[in-house]
Amino acid sequence: MTENSEKIDRLNDLTTFISTKTGVKGLVDAEITEVPSMFHVPSSILSNNRPSDISGLNLTVPIIDLGDRNTSSRNVVISKIKDAAENWGFFQVINHDVPLTVLEEIKESVRRFHEQDPVVKNQYLPTDNNKRFVYNNDFDLYHSSPLNWRDSFTCYIAPDPPNPEEIPLACRSAVIEYTKHVMELGAVLFQLLSEALGLDSETLKRIDCLKGLFMLCHYYPPCPQPDLTLGISKHTDNSFLTLLLQDQIGGLQVLHEDYWVDVPPVPGALVVNIGDFMQLITNDKFLSVEHRVRPNKDRPRISVACFFSSSLSPNSTVYGPIKDLLSDENPAKYKDITIPEYTAGFLASIFDEKSYLTNYMI
């Protein structure tokens, strides 16, 4: 088979997949026993690259208790966040004040939406650019090769909140309640991160890191051959900060010291990761690192990611490394950017081999 005929076959497979309008879940509901070739990932990419002897390595993503942030131990919390942001780019937080009932309801509402009749879900397909809630069962079909094993929906929360009626009834109240708590927790985290940089606690808020928020909710159906594909290919986030709620299934991995490290679910915890914009404005002090999701064979996996970013809203603000972090010994490493400009290029190259952020290095 020639390369050209392979491309034609793939395009035909994609066209058929799109026409069903049932997403990856539709494949599973049809009781397929083999993963279609358009989802296949080379085995070299799927490898964890982990040596047999890891006794000398710290491969545990930090877990930070935020319960002491308003006590005399605040500096201890800040120190832990600083270390995690500098060395991992990822950490989990507990005692974050988001009620467990709210966490459980948003996960259940994401499940409800994705497991309802496709006819209902398809009302939210991306037919125009003005929708505040979009169902993406073909989120990256023409940009990702191979395809990812997931279905998703996106909801744009801030700075321009959607009308409640724009959010499907299956998840409306849960989305509104959960994102309210996420905005409150985001304000706390940006204060702590500001202090971890040695700056005034309101610094990151003042430059509008908290201004924009959108959520991306993934449903990963059980995969008959999980060793052949990925739920999400490796990538970094085009955000200042991302808050992720994952269920107890597992599958999230972060690249640390060239190894893919599991981020095990911790009941009641939220995963926090540094985004590209934060790495840029901190001049590489905080790291935006690659991460991915492995599918599983037994049960669907749910995740709820909230991105602090105004990347999909008009925003003329110019961002560059924060001046107070620079010196003769630590000059600016990045050019100035606007968020929309960066996002356009990021989305066009999201699954490239190298981080898009490298394009803005001086």
Swiss-Prot record:
Fe cation binds at H235, D237, H291. Pfam families: 2OG-FeII_Oxy, DIOX_N. The keyword Oxidoreductase applies. InterPro entries: DIOX_N, IPNS-like_FE2OG_OXY, IPNS-like_sf, Oxoglu/Fe-dep_dioxygenase_dom. Residues 211-310 form the Fe2OG dioxygenase domain. Induction: By ethylene. Slightly induced in leaf blades in low light intensities. 2-oxoglutarate binds at R301. GO terms for biological process: biosynthetic process. Keywords: Iron, Metal-binding, Oxidoreductase. Its EC number is 1.14.-.-. GO terms for molecular function: 1-aminocyclopropane-1-carboxylate oxidase activity; dioxygenase activity; metal ion binding. Belongs to the iron/ascorbate-dependent oxidoreductase family. This is 1-aminocyclopropane-1-carboxylate oxidase homolog 10.
